[in-house]
Amino acid sequence: MKFNNMIDHTLLKAEATTKDVDKLIAEAKEYGFKSVCVNSSWVKYVKEKLKGSDVLVCAVVGFPLGAMSMQAKVFEAKLAIDHGADEIDMVINIGRFRDDQHDYVLNEIKKIKEVMGNKVLKVIIETALLDKKGIKDATNIVLQSGAEFIKTSTGFSYSGAQVEDIEVFKEILGDKVAIKASGGIKNLNDMKNLYKAGARRFGTSAAVAIVKEQGKQ
């Protein structure tokens, strides 16, 4: 199995330069990755550079903390879509979620989805900051929200994608909502294990190394 078309080739570090983004774009085209995932200020630039290719543009919203106002997130999402984003990866308000303000979290996801039209929304719940009950509750919120994907992590917290968390997602969601694993995916074995658990999209900055490893097998 080839994982190329399941990978969001990702560059989200604060210090990313134009040269870094150009390299990301070139690699995504060369290896046939599903998307290039960048911070929202890069969307217009990346969209222009990807013109004529099948690679999608994915933008993060409310990243990495998820703690800004709902209005700010909705505006960022709309602007990213207007600039050409095909997909949005948003971070939920984790503090509000942990305060049991589940209606707030659900409403925020729905409001972002509303401004996206038919574009794909992935919802990051940051599993590292939740216990097992929290992961289940957050998964159920995503199930009600109309989002196309649930996503494990930003890659900026204590840990990233874990097989056991993907299994919890799958048990609750079945095939109703797709699963994206991200954070700490460093090699082909990581990706295979997460795929077996139910993940069908992968966010990683190690994509080139992983597909080269895949090519040797």
From Swiss-Prot:
Cystine pairs: none
EC number(s) stated in the UniProt entry for this protein: 4.1.2.4
Reaction catalysed by this enzyme: 2-deoxy-D-ribose 5-phosphate = D-glyceraldehyde 3-phosphate + acetaldehyde
Primary localisation category: cytoplasm
SMART domains hit by this protein: DeoC
InterPro entries cross-referenced by the UniProt entry: Aldolase_TIM (IPR013785), DeoC (IPR011343), DeoC/FbaB/LacD_aldolase (IPR002915), DeoC_typeI (IPR028581)
Alphabetized GO MF terms: deoxyribose-phosphate aldolase activity
Keywords: Cytoplasm, Lyase, Schiff base
Origin: domain of life: Bacteria
Cellular component GO terms, alphabetical: cytoplasm
Protein name: Deoxyribose-phosphate aldolase
Protein's organism: Mycoplasma mobile (strain ATCC 43663 / 163K / NCTC 11711)
